[in-house]
Regions:
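Hydrophobic transmembrane alpha-helices of multi-pass small-molecule transport proteins
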Residues: 48, 131-151, 203, 257, ...
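Juxtamembrane helix-loop-helix junctions in multi-pass membrane proteins
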Residues: 16-46, 65-70, 104-108, 174-198, ...
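Helix-helix packing/entry segments at the starts of transmembrane helices
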Residues: 15, 39, 109-115, 179-200, ...
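Glycine-/small-residue-enriched transmembrane alpha-helix faces in small-molecule transporters
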Residues: 1-39, 48-49, 87, 91, ...
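Specific transmembrane alpha-helical segments of multi-pass solute transporters/efflux pumps
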Residues: 21, 55-112, 148, 229-247
Length: 305
């Protein structure tokens, strides 16, 4: 199995976890957005601390060096990466949770948040990354698929929550590009730990500044906090960091937007929700876009010539 295939599978698993987390996030919309984010982020830190130790022990048993930064420069780079990725993730997650709190429609939230699938390659142009025609066609197919899947009744009027979710998509795009820049240079699990420590501190400060967090809230919403903290934050974002290595960030964003597909399929399989022909067509188009983006068309055409 090639590294690209393995990384793509990690990102698909990441998308699967994120897709099921939308329901949990919506269930937590009755809680303050920053308080909910603080709860899930501290839970992620608690999960990642022993995970780092476990990976170090595994590497030692295999005779490989662990991921600890060995020099002051490496430690500084890890802190810089964690601070940048964590700040972007905090801002993106806060915008998303605030948007969902104002309008708990998971369908529209899923569509608008997944617009990073277009924004990542667009922002990449400013960094000198020109995507192939194959990639841009895949992006267009993905947007059509997302619209068919998520927007059953059209947009309706633009709400303030929509602008927050679009801001979330912009910030997630920056976070994806930051992970793409830093992840090949350091241990991915450690980067995820520092990233979520930054998110935890930022969201805790914001919760005390703008909300009135109470222990009763954390008890009431313990289920959504635990699921989002352990699975969506602790596991899925670590898979994102590991999966983005050696993978074009535009292709990575395309794979991760499958969270909308997995959200719909999960509702159909587990909650027995109806999946219309329109929604099924959206799922098919999204999967087709991901496959098209990774087909070695250039190599195939050269071999035929």
């Amino acid at each position: 199995m090639t590294n690209q295939t393995k990384n793509s599978m990690l990102l698909m698993l990441c998308a699967l976890i994120w897709g099921t987390a939308f329901v949990a996030q919506s269930a937590g919309s009755g809680m303050g957005a920053f308080s909910f984010l603080a709860g899930r982020s501290w839970m992620a830190v608690l999960v990642l601390l022993p995970t780092v130790k476990a990976f170090d022990a595994l590497h030692h048993r295999q005779g490989r060096p662990d991921g600890k930064p060995k020099t002051a420069a490496e430690r500084k780079l890890l802190l810089k990466a964690g601070l940048m990725c964590g700040t972007l993730l905090f801002l993106a997650s806060a915008a998303q949770q605030l948007g969902i709190t104002l309008d708990p429609s998971t369908a529209k939230a899923g569509f608008l948040t997944a617009m990073y699938v277009v924004l990542v390659p667009v922002f990449g142009l400013f960094l000198g990354r020109k995507g192939s025609a194959q990639l841009w066609v895949s992006m267009a197919i993905a947007v059509v698929g997302l619209y068919l899947l998520c927007m059953k009744d059209g947009f309706g009027s633009i709400q303030s929550s929509d602008w927050l979710l679009l801001l979330c998509a912009v910030l997630f795009s920056f976070q994806i590009m930051a992970v793409d820049h830093f992840s090949p240079q350091m241990d991915g699990v450690r980067l995820s730990l520092v990233e979520f420590f930054v998110v935890s501190v930022d969201s805790t400060v914001a919760a005390f500044l703008f909300e009135q967090p109470a222990m009763a809230e954390f008890v009431t919403f313990a289920g959504p906090i635990l699921y989002c903290g352990i699975m969506s934050s602790g596991v899925a974002y670590t898979l994102q960091i590991l999966g983005q290595r050696d993978l074009n960030p535009a292709v990575a964003s395309l794979i991760m937007c499958l969270e909308s597909v997995f959200s719909a399929l999960g509702g159909w399989l587990l909650l027995h929700q109806n999946l219309s022909f329109r929604e099924s067509s959206g799922c098919v188009l999204l999967f087709a876009a991901v496959v098209l983006a990774q087909l070695p068309l250039g190599r195939l055409m050269r071999s035929k010539a």
